[in-house]
Curated annotation (Swiss-Prot):
Main location: cytoplasm
Region (Involved in Mg(2+) ion dislocation from EF-Tu): 81-84
Protein name: Elongation factor Ts
Compartments where found: Cytoplasm
Pfam family, one: EF_TS
CDD domains registered for this protein in UniProt: UBA_EF-Ts
Taxonomy, superkingdom: Bacteria
Family assignment from sequence similarity: Belongs to the EF-Ts family.
UniProt-listed InterPro entries: EF-Ts_dimer_sf, Transl_elong_EFTs/EF1B, Transl_elong_EFTs/EF1B_dimer, Transl_elong_Ts_CS, UBA-like_sf
Keyword Cytoplasm annotated: yes
Primary role: Associates with the EF-Tu.GDP complex and induces the exchange of GDP to GTP. It remains bound to the aminoacyl-tRNA.EF-Tu.GTP complex up to the GTP hydrolysis stage on the ribosome.
GO cellular component terms listed in the entry, alphabetical order: cytoplasm
Keywords, sorted A to Z: Cytoplasm, Elongation factor, Protein biosynthesis
Length: 278
């Protein structure tokens, strides 16, 4: 008996771009485990698996609250349709909540939701009230507060008629508005997951190494060539996944490492929120 449904196959196709039969086989071999199925499709050579998996059907916005150039907050507020995302009250609440986070520094989402907000109501109650008025579920998904020597932000609208759905914060060790802006736009466009190779967890590196080896074998590469092939593919992973390893979008002859070295700055932290993404 199959451990998956037709809806699971459809979802996996949307996430990976792989064919229906390939998705069915991957789900069968993985016992219905989505993560293992995606990994199996990567080994089989499905294109753009990771990039497609980041796509989302969620709606909502990313709100920004920034205090000068040393502190900023990003907050994601979700709704069910883009019609509500355009709603002034929805946008106002998101902006107010981002400001509230900036002032109160809650430790996590549950702490924020249970915090006293206004008129004896908690943040959760205020969200529920607006949800009842608008007629859609509204969810406060996440937030991040960054404080440091120099913090820059970048907000992006995927549709001019909608509020921002992508936001980036970058913390540098010293002020440099031009470089900070370039880095924020770089992060928005190419979505690195880590600052440098040193920041990539060992288990992630080992998993990429294992997938690279399995993929090379699937392609029929000779066993003696595997170490070199695997290292080459790992280097490609680091180039994509780390900010400092990426080519600079304004000048692809340079890496971001070279850009920050020339500017004499250090990237201490970055946050990238896109509506619906992890």
């Amino acid at each position: 008996m199959a451990n998956y449904t037709a809806a699971d196959v459809k979802r996996l196709r949307e996430l990976t771009g792989a064919g229906m039969m390939a998705c069915k086989k991957a789900l069968e071999e993985s016992g219905g485990d989505f993560d293992k199925a995606i990994e199996a499709l990567r080994i089989k050579g499905a294109k753009d698996v990771g990039k497609r998996a980041e796509r989302t059907a969620a709606n909502g916005l990313i709100a920004l609250a920034q205090d000068g150039d040393t502190s900023a907050v990003l907050l994601e507020l979700n709704c069910e349709t883009d019609f509500v995302a355009k709603n002034d009250k929805f946008q106002e609440l998101a902006a107010e909540l981002a400001g509230f986070v900036a002032r109160t520094s809650p430790s996590d989402v549950p702490s924020l939701l249970s915090a006293d907000y206004a008129d004896g109501k908690t943040v959760s109650q205020v969200i529920e009230e607006l949800s009842a008025v608008i007629g859609e579920k509204i969810e406060l998904r996440r937030f991040a507060k960054v404080e440091g020597a120099y913090v820059a932000s970048y907000m992006h609208k995927s549709d001019p008629d909608l509020p921002p759905t992508l936001g980036v914060l970058v913390e540098l060790d010293k002020p440099n508005a031009e470089v900070a802006k370039d880095l924020a736009q770089q992060i928005a466009a190419l979505a690195p997951k880590y600052i440098s190779r040193d920041d990539v967890p060992a288990d992630v590196v080992e998993n990429e190494r294992r997938i690279a080896k399995a993929t090379a074998r699937e392609e029929g590469k000779p066993e003696q060539a595997l170490p070199k092939i695997v290292e080459g593919r790992l280097n490609g992973f680091f180039k994509d996944a780390t900010l400092l390893g990426q080519p600079f979008v304004k000048d692809n002859k340079k890496t971001i490492q070279q850009v920050v070295d020339e500017a004499g700055v250090t990237v201490r932290r970055f946050v990238r929120f896109k509506v619906g993404q992890a």
